[in-house]
Amino acid sequence: MKTEQINSKTEVIQYDSLQEFYDYLINTPFNQAFCWSEHGSVTGSKSFTKTESFSEAVELFKSGWSDMASNLVQRLKVIESKTEPTMKPRNKLDVCGYQAIVPLYIQGVPNNMMNKKMVPVKQKVITINKSLDYNGMTSSDKIIEESIKAMQIVKKLEAQGFRCNLNIVLGTTAGYGKNEKQFVVKVRIKSANEKMNVSKLAFPLVHPSMLRRLFFRFVEVYPNVTKDFVGGYGHPAHSSELRKVFAGEYLLPNFVKKDVSKINTIDDLENV
């Protein structure tokens, strides 16, 4: 866990893994602001969270959301089948080609011709932050729909050779004037050296309870949270605010407006 005070208003809290985030939630007592207040992480309805209880959300977090994982595998296969990796020509010696290598020909070496072979381009490592900043009026089904888009985009980029770090982020703000506070929570759910594990990612990336139970629990336990967050858990940070915090990285906003089928390169991630 790393914390950084960006300014008097904004504090960024980063977790290097889902396990580190979970351990913090489970082992940290309720903060002073929420100690005697209602805990939305517990009382949230099934229609709002898609789970019956906090315990059910934790179980899905630990064991995986198998129903959605099966659905996602099929969707991602379609995405992968329509995506071709970026290729570049590479010279190689061959028995036939466009130019003879005379010394090799004289020596009787069979591979005495210069030819070209198309090989995948090794792409750079990029970091993508998926915003889970949905307000209370956003339906749980809409959260699922938008979050699936994020997984499809990452799959397309990796099929082209990009290596993606993937984070989920929550930015929440409450208070006014000098008392205004903003907390930006960033959780690494996939490292660039990992292949996409749909079973592992289905719950934290797609399930509404990741926001409405587990991230709510973070607000309930993090010591610096003030009483202004009680009740509504703050209001979502704007995408422009998150982009400033994560300069040099890519942001997938809560609502992706572009057609996912038209997002093919990292250049297409601008203003999605």
Description of each model-found segment:
Residues T43-V125:
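Negatively charged sequence features
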Residues M1-K62, Q123, Y134-S139, I148, ...:
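Acidic, glycine-rich A-domain
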Residues V95-V169:
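Internal, hydrophobic cores of structured domains that mediate oligomerization or house catalytic pockets
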